[in-house]
Amino acid sequence: PVGWNLPMGSIHRKNHGDGFMLLGDAAGLVDPFTGEGIGNAMVAAKYAVRVAKKAHHLGEFNAKIFQEYDELVWEELGGELGTSAKLQKLARYSFLLNFVIKRAARSKDVQEIISGMLSNEIARDDLSNPSFYFKILLS
């Protein structure tokens, strides 16, 4: 079997043009840190339907009309995808990743913090903040 890499959401790719809007993996909306994409695809679908209805009403299906779709999607998902891209880069530092994992293995509080961030209950931005690691150090 031959496969291909999924386009991660760390880069804002063109997701529309004359007569089309791309959603989900095709639009590069895969979360760079978790690899999850279904939730982002559903967000994109919500906006694609809204913009497609507008385009149908106007009888225009050009890139200019579909630009609104791009703006809506990235307004909602851009910040989260950007943070996930930062986290992906942070994970390349094995000493930092090992430090967090070792702390999580010993501390229920750290486990809950990380779990909350991965489930979006706690802001992921905290993971890229040095104070987060200081907090873990003291846990």
Mark where each language-model region is.
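FAD/FMN-dependent oxidoreductases across multiple families
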Residues: 1-51, 57
